[in-house]
Amino acid sequence: MIGRRTVLAGGLSLPSAAEAQSPWKGYYAKGTRQRPVRFAADDGTMLAGTLLLPAWSELQRVPGFVLVAGSGPTDRNGNNPLVPARIDTLRLIAERLAEAGFGTLRYDKRGIGASTQMPSALADQERFTAWDQFVGDVRAAHAELLKHDEIKRYATGLLGHSEGGLLVLAAAPTISQNKPHVMVLAATPGRPYGEILRRQLQRAAPTLIDGVERALGAIRNNGRPPAGLPAELQPLFPAYIGPFLQGAMAFDPAAALATSPLGCLLLHGGADQQIVPMNDIQPLIDALGNRGAGGEAMVAAGVSHNLKAVTGPNDPGFTGPLAPAIADKLATWSRAALGA
């Protein structure tokens, strides 16, 4: 069983050269193979994605992960048109896991990229973007992963970044057949969605907090954002967002982790400006330590919300490679947990 421990990056023991390479490197072909995929969600929405495999998966089945993107209009690679930089966090994670011997399936969220686009009518938009739909999409992606012959059906996991980690926590117990065995929660909040949203706005725009409280209260009570919100808040609370936020605010990530039987790795950046250590993540660390299933938590110093090294307090950490401490911990923990 994977032991429970919390690792701070300053005290991290780096893996040896033998641990850091795949057991098949030197025997099988290096490199990767990529395959486009399309699969149907529960409501018939078509989701488009990419299956990335180690080259040796032609000869040897490999463990696999579903990668789940964070909030907003984020595509399969972890890029968001609202951010003026290529982030590529999910693409980089997929490539690092392929080097370590894992296949990955990452997909464009509904309404994004090559997946089915948002309908035009408000009622249809509310149904299309409801919380349960996004949870179901994780379930559908895991089922799609298992359809590919290169993947070991008994050695799969779910990895979610930011809000994607909440969706992983919500989806995992709803997968009744060929269940995933582990999950990785990267930069995932440990508090309910409404609390995190309040904290973020309190830090970034404290003058808007009254409007945030009014919006969250209206959505909680009647499922719709109120009229007359300040212009600055309207992008956060579009007319269709009520059903999504109702579901998200009712979900307690720490409680979900506390009852999960899956091995779990928590990965966080010490310089995360969105999900701030330790306050925003401590409930997950506490839940991890108080349950019977195995797991580890890592908070890497000088690492951003997007798992990149930062150069200083004003660096958002959008660009560049994955922080080495994060990439190495992900690879070594996943190999130990799933046997790659």
Task: Name each region found by the language model.
Residues 1-12:
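N-terminal secretory signal peptides and thylakoid transit peptides that target proteins
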Residues 58-60, 65-96:
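Short, surface-exposed "cap/lid" segments of acyl-processing enzymes
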Residues 126-147:
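Alpha/beta-hydrolase active-site loop
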Residues 144-148, 154-200:
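Primarily recognizes the serine-hydrolase "nucleophile elbow" in alpha/beta-hydrolase
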